[in-house]
Regions:
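Transmembrane helical core of 7TM receptor-like proteins
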Residues: 1-321
Length: 321
């Protein structure tokens, strides 16, 4: 019986429905979604440019820009993990995906999301030290500390999410194997498994609450402390500039975390949510944040702007010669 189940599981093919219940309208729905995914291509370009700049400019080899580079690399991974299957659905109506490919995509999406969450925590800590303890910044955020924070984010994501594909492989998949997303999502796949999924489902929910929820609390606490420090500054212009930067950062954090945590909770507790809401939320944090991060965190940085101007000026001079 175990051999049969294993064989059935390994030969399973899944069907990515995109927006379940609205398949006949996909031709029209694809227009705004395709625009969103074209924006995702812009996100790929923006993050690639950021990585090149941080690597090329020595004055950008500072903790905050190291975290920015890691964030850009994570965003690149998220975009490349999701965009192919999403574009295949809406542009070419290709919906079938094998179990191995589905498990691989699911692992990378969830792992990279966890890594990005850890990087956002590290970036919040970086800003906390820079604004609240500027004189001790270089003492606290040494190269060793930056390496430890980056490594912890990567190891946490890979280690805690490694069991998910193995959980799914222990179950046979009997039925139509229709996934209600445009990519492979753990709770979605788990709902198609035959057997007792109580532990596997609880593990997924506890992971989300104990990582992403804890990260959100730390980030919000950090920015509250930052705002408290900023409000005590005397220079009104500095107040406005710092407040504006913090507000932009918080908006990006909310765009990433709210859909992610809401999706996990809704999948666990209800099956009656509108499929359009599911699809919109699932694509918001996977496609919008890779676009917003270079704009919010990078282009607002004077050092990044200076590096961009320098690079373009050099290219123009070379072209002129």
């Amino acid at each position: 019986m175990t051999t049969l189940n294993s064989s059935n599981t390994l030969s399973s093919t899944f069907y990515l429905s995109g927006i379940p219940g609205y398949e006949e309208f996909h031709h029209w729905i694809s227009i705004p979604f395709c625009l969103l995914y074209l924006v995702g291509i812009m996100a790929l370009v923006g993050n690639a440019v950021l990585l090149i700049l941080v690597r090329a400019e020595k004055n950008l080899h500072e903790p905050q820009f190291c975290f920015l580079a890691m964030l850009a690399l994570t965003d690149l991974g998220l975009s490349l993990s999701t965009m192919p299957s999403v574009l295949a659905i809406f542009w070419f109506d290709v919906r079938d995906i094998g179990l191995n490919a589905c498990l691989t995509q699911m692992f990378f999406i969830h792992t990279l999301s966890s890594v990005e969450s850890g990087v956002l925590v590290a970036m919040a800590f970086d800003r906390l030290v820079a604004i609240c303890a500027p004189l001790n910044y270089t003492k606290i955020l040494t190269h060793y500390t930056v390496a430890c924070l980056s490594g912890a984010a990567l190891i946490r994501g890979a280690t805690l999410l490694a069991p998910l594909p193995f959980f799914l492989r222990t179950f046979p998949f009997c039925g139509a194997n229709i996934l209600s997303h445009s990519y492979c999502y753990y709770p979605d796949m788990l709902n198609l498994a035959c057997g007792d999924i109580t532990f596997s489902s609880a593990y997924g929910l506890v992971f989300v609450l104990c990582t992403f929820a804890v990260d959100v609390v730390f980030i919000l606490a950090s920015y509250m402390k930052i705002l408290d420090t900023i409000m005590k500054l005397e220079t009104q212009d500095r107040n406005w500039r710092s407040l504006h930067t913090c507000a932009c950062h918080l908006c990006t954090v909310l765009v990433f975390y709210l859909p992610l945590i809401s999706l996990a909770v809704l999948h666990h507790y209800t099956q009656d949510t509108s499929p359009i809401l599911y699809t919109t939320m699932s694509n918001a944090y996977l496609l919008m944040t890779p676009l917003l991060n270079p704009l919010i965190y990078s282009l607002k940085s004077r050092q990044i702007q200076a590096a961009l101007r320098k690079r373009f000026w050099v290219q123009r001079v070379i072209a002129g010669e």
